[in-house]
Amino acid sequence: MKIDIGVDNKCGDFVTYMKDEAFNSQLHYISAISSFPISKMMELLPLSGNETIYESVNVLSSVDLSDLNRCIRSLYQRIIFSPLPKQSDANTDDSNNSNNANMQMETGKIKTDRHWICIEGIQTMFQYSQLKDPVEAHASLNDTMLRLRLLQNKCPSIEILFLLPPHEAPEFIQSLQEHDISRNNIPHRRQGKRFKRDNTGILIGDYIWKYYI
């Protein structure tokens, strides 16, 4: 699992990930604060000729941590326990699978599935959950994070990314700055600016970084 600060330029990363022909890539985008940046992505990757890629983008909405927990549980079932083909469709599925395998063999390599789960707006989800039930908010967060960790342990090819604005993870940013300073032997000067915590007293980006990543 990773944290990325700044969400404005992620479409380039999405396109690079989805265009990698060595894999059957799937992007799962979960957000509480915005819609998927489809227009920006289409500027980089036109829809015409790339329909299969866009069909592999799964956009989910999550208002609070309970919603997020349900989304992650659903993805867990989808990724780990993929349903077997129905018996009545066996011949058709076998034929399709054979054709797909032949096409992949012609390219010299059979593609494997991989998944990228991007979560945006975790602070907003936490705040909504805190307003309803603080105890349940922490329980939902813990269950979600443990399920994500279990999912990644079972499928190491899965990438999990939390997209955060800088003010939601100031301690994480400071750790990156201190790492760069120590690596480059630059004299360290502490910044005077302090980020304000939200009304729950918790910046969830820093919390996730400290206890789950």
Swiss-Prot record:
Classification via Gene3D superfamilies: P-loop containing nucleotide triphosphate hydrolases
One Gene Ontology CC term in the entry: cytoplasm
InterPro entries, sorted: Csm2 (IPR031783), P-loop_NTPase (IPR027417)
One Pfam family, short name: CSM2
Keyword set, alphabetical order: Cytoplasm, DNA damage, DNA repair, Meiosis, Nucleus
Main location: cytoplasm
Lineage: superkingdom: Eukaryota
GO process annotations (BP): meiotic cell cycle; recombinational repair
Localization annotation: Cytoplasm; Nucleus
Family: Belongs to the CSM2 family.
Function, in words: Involved in chromosome segregation during meiosis. Promotes efficient recombinational repair and functions in the protection of the genome from spontaneous and induced DNA damage like mutations and gross chromosomal rearrangements (GCRs).
Protein name in UniProt: Chromosome segregation in meiosis protein 2
Organism in which the protein naturally occurs: Kluyveromyces lactis (strain ATCC 8585 / CBS 2359 / DSM 70799 / NBRC 1267 / NRRL Y-1140 / WM37) (Yeast)
Gene responsible for this protein: CSM2
